[in-house]
């Protein structure tokens, strides 16, 4: 997928990502809003980078950006928060970082909240409940190719679902914490519903980095996972539509 915005091919920001990755969705939306030319390769960086002769970044995350290094080659870089700051230094137009220091700090906290806490909602609702896990197990492999043969889809679904369900502990999701995570998600939606009645973005009339962080997670919570989608439609239709607007 290529987006040409009056710039040459060599000036495009390159990245590798996945439709089911909330951080990929966060950064693609940010690039589009900031009108930064980009070229995205949909796939797995652990497969794509070696084929390009590039070293894997540490840690290996989605999305993976490719930036020029000191030698004139390309280097794989991850972690969306510092990448946002790097992009600001490269292109200051349509900034997503508030100029006021106090607002900038609040925006940073909101971005961190989205990246580190709202992602717990996403992973919990994606894999904790059997219906949701079955849904994600089917859809996520297809995001890499809707023409995936049925027998291969079945194999990948089983492997991916077992692996991800076994990793629920990483975000602190289990039968004991499930009601706590659910209650937190519902409070978040209620707060968003009240807030969006007053203004269209978290800090005013245009989005900051925090908006894009929340958006990334909500693309999955509102758009993919059946349980969280139903809760969102019930408690905060404004958040549902805000996710589409973003």
Name these PLM-found stretches.
Residues 120-245:
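GST-like fold's C-terminal all-alpha helical module
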Residues 1, 55, 227-231:
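Short secondary-structure boundary/capping segments
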Residues 4-151, 202:
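GST-like domain detector, emphasizing the conserved glutathione-binding G-site
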């Amino acid at each position: 997928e290529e987006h040409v915005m009056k710039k040459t091919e060599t000036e495009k920001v390159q990245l590798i990502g996945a439709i089911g990755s909330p951080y990929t969705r966060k950064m693609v939306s940010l690039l589009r809003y900031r009108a930064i030319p980009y070229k995205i390769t949909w796939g797995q960086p652990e497969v794509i980078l070696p084929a390009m002769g590039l070293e894997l970044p540490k840690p290996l995350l989605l999305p993976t950006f490719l930036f020029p290094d000191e030698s004139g080659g390309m280097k794989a870089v991850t972690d969306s928060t510092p990448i946002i700051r790097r992009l600001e230094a490269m292109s200051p137009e349509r900034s997503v970082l508030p100029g006021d220091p106090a607002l900038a700090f609040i925006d940073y906290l909101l971005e961190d909240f989205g990246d580190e806490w709202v992602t717990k909602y996403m992973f919990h609702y994606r894999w904790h409940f059997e219906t949701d896990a079955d849904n994600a197990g089917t859809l996520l492999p297809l995001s890499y190719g809707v023409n995936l043969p049925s027998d291969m889809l079945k194999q990948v679904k089983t492997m991916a679902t077992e692996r991800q369900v076994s990793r629920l502990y990483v975000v602190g999701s289990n039968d004991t914490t499930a009601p706590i995570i659910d209650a937190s998600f519902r409070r978040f939606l209620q707060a968003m519903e009240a807030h969006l009645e007053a203004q269209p973005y978290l800090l005013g009339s245009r989005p900051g980095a925090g908006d894009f962080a929340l958006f990334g997670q909500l693309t999955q919570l509102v758009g993919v996972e059946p349980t969280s989608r139903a809760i969102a439609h019930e408690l905060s239709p404004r958040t549902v539509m805000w996710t589409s607007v973003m």
